[in-house]
Regions:
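C-terminal cap of thioredoxin/glutaredoxin-like
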Residues: 3-6, 11-33, 37, 115-201
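Structural alpha/beta surface segment adjacent to cysteine/selenocysteine redox centers
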Residues: 15-120
Length: 201
């Protein structure tokens, strides 16, 4: 048995947004246990692996990827994808993923993460502005003051670093990735394959 799947993501990734919007329903339809949602630091992942994603200048953002993201959003009835000013570098912050770690401790990681993704890619809000993180927190009934304190705690910072290091140790190089035992399914378009692997168990 592979056990429960783990969904790795960060809020700066539009493909993670697309995956987050449908992963729960895919698992529910397949009648398999919902995955663990695990926020990680994409920035640390890239620094460690040396990978250069499609979204980074000077070559990126790649217009083909942007068009594909919008096509998928349209096909799934999602709002027009809006990128915050300064995306993907200038607005990158650890505060949203730290807040997600805090939300996980409170049992609200899924609702917070969806609220945060929608702030970024449906509303185009800059999540390096902590006030926008707190809007997402309030949307899932997390007290903004508690979140503000939580993201500064050593415990939350250590858990985020440990989760990112674990992702690296599993061979994860990009997000979103769904880990099913030793198998890694990298990309929004790989979710169905991951579900099929779980159903074979």
């Amino acid at each position: 048995m592979t056990g429960r799947a783990t969904f790795y993501y960060d809020f700066n990734s539009p493909y993670s947004y697309l995956a987050a919007e449908r992963i729960s329903s895919l698992f529910a339809e397949a009648e398999i246990e919902q995955p663990e949602w695990q926020p990680i630091s994409f920035g640390h992942l890239l620094q460690t692996t040396g990978r250069r994603p499609w979204s980074l200048p000077p070559e990126g953002p790649d217009p083909d990827h942007l068009a594909e993201i919008q096509r998928r959003a349209d096909d799934r009835g999602l709002p027009k994808v809006v990128y915050p000013e300064g995306w993907p570098i200038e607005n990158y912050s650890l505060n949203p993923v730290r807040a997600a770690v805090y939300a996980k401790e409170s049992g609200r990681v899924v609702s917070f993460s969806l609220a945060c993704f929608r702030q970024v890619f449906a509303a185009g809000r800059d999540m390096s502005d902590v006030d926008n993180v707190l809007v997402a927190a309030a949307a899932c009934e997390l007290h903004p003051n508690a979140v503000l304190k939580g993201i500064e705690t050593k415990s939350v910072k250590d858990k985020l670093r440990a989760a990112t290091d674990e992702a690296l140790s599993r061979g994860i190089e990009g997000i979103p990735t769904l880990a099913v035992g030793d198998e890694l399914f990298w990309g929004d378009d790989k979710l169905e394959e991951a579900v099929a692997a779980l159903r074979r168990e």
